[in-house]
Amino acid sequence: MPKMKTKSSAKKRFKITASGKVLAAAAGKRHGMIKRSNKFIRNARGTMVLAEADGKKVIKNYLPNGL
């Protein structure tokens, strides 16, 4: 059976660290920021580490061969 292909959309959105954690950009920052608190905007900057269960799903289903 051939190897499963990596999803191109996931390549752009996720990064796997050396320890196996999955990094992703914070959600909810596209529009409507005027009503958000400054704390939310500050904390949503940069990347976030996905929860362990979500990270495993991403790796298994979308990034089977890593990046």
UniProtKB/Swiss-Prot annotation:
Keywords: Ribonucleoprotein, Ribosomal protein
GO cellular component terms listed in the entry, alphabetical order: cytosolic large ribosomal subunit
Keyword Magnesium: no
Signal peptide span: none
Stored InterPro entries: Ribosomal_bL35 (IPR001706), Ribosomal_bL35-like (IPR021137), Ribosomal_bL35_CS (IPR018265), Ribosomal_bL35_sf (IPR037229)
GO molecular function terms noted in the UniProt entry: structural constituent of ribosome
SUPFAM superfamilies: L35p-like
BP terms from Gene Ontology: translation
One Pfam family per UniProt: Ribosomal_L35p
Family membership: Belongs to the bacterial ribosomal protein bL35 family.
Protein known as: Large ribosomal subunit protein bL35
